[in-house]
Each structure stands twice: as C-alpha cells, then as structure tokens.
Curated annotation (Swiss-Prot):
Taxonomy, superkingdom: Bacteria
Residues annotated as transmembrane: 4-26, 31-50, 55-77
Matching Pfam families: DUF2651
Protein name: Uncharacterized protein YycQ
Protein's organism: Bacillus subtilis (strain 168)
A cellular component annotation (GO) from this entry: plasma membrane
Protein's membrane topology: Multi-pass membrane protein
Subcellular location: Cell membrane
Disulfide bonds: none
Key words of the record: Cell membrane, Membrane, Transmembrane, Transmembrane helix
Keyword flag Membrane: yes
Length: 82
C-alpha cells in the first residue's frame, strides 16, 4: 500500500465521514442514518478493496464513530441555536 493511500485512510476518509455525518443530519433529519450509511459503505469497501482483511475493521468502526459523533454534535448544536 502506497504512502498516499495510507494518508487518505488516516486523514481523508475520517474527514469525509465527518462531513457526511453533518450533511446526513441535515438531509435526513435523523442522527443515525448517516452513520449507518457510512458503516454499510465501509463494510462493502472492506470486503471489495481490502479483500476482507479483518485488520481494517478498526477503521470501519472509527469511520462510523466519527460520523455518529459529528451527526449527534450537529443535532445538539442545531437544537442549541434554534
């Protein structure tokens, strides 16, 4: 795996998961929909791109957690400022 791929896994995907958590909350009006989509997408990518390597399950959990945290934070901030 190249250096660019590692940087994208460590920095790129978490940023995308966070942005998707925020956008998903505004689009779907539920805090759990975006993390669920991130989880399903990450699992599909784990099986297809990483050939089912179970060591990448850590990243699947991290991306889902990041999406969940940003979605819940957006929920609380939205209620706080309304």
């Amino acid at each position: 795996m190249g250096a660019i791929a590692v940087l994208f896994i460590v920095f790129g995907f978490p940023i995308v998961a966070g942005v998707f958590g925020i956008a998903g909350h505004f689009l779907f009006k539920r805090f759990w929909v975006a993390p669920l989509i991130v989880l399903i997408t990450s699992l599909i990518l784990l099986v297809t791109l990483a050939s089912g390597n179970s060591s990448f399950i850590f990243w699947v959990v991290m991306y889902t957690a990041i999406a969940l945290v940003t979605s819940v934070a957006t929920l609380f901030l939205r209620k706080f400022f309304e």
